[in-house]
Amino acid sequence: QDRSSAASDVYKRQHIRQSLENLKPVLDENITTIYGLEVPLFSEHLGVAGRCDCIAEFNGVPSIIDFKTSRYIKKKEKISNYFAQGAAYSIMWEERTGLTAPNIVIIMDVDHEKPSVFVEHRDNWTELLHNTIKEYRTRKMFGH
């Protein structure tokens, strides 16, 4: 391993450690029961699969929790794809387990800022999810 690669590894470890320290208060204050971490999910109904970061109770409500990093603060309007992804995980979780996780929580570690936390209800994002899946299949079918 050359010096630049080793230095990069050290930087990444420090960055991960700093992110965890930044997120710790949010996690400690809001998350109670954890149902799963890095949960592999799939849906025959949707025809998609993925791996969910965390399924836990957030402020007492079973929730799909996705962790993101960003160099700058993002507005809710700019992260609709994150909510659609969370809606997919929520549907997959319910299909696989029979348990509902109606909320989608995006916890974003932002460089040099406090973490951003967005909480949305799954049902607000299912239409976008279905449209995204349909668009993906259409593009794939026509080779775009």
Predicted regions span which residues?
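Residue-level preference for beta-strand/loop junctions
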Residues: 3, 33, 46-48
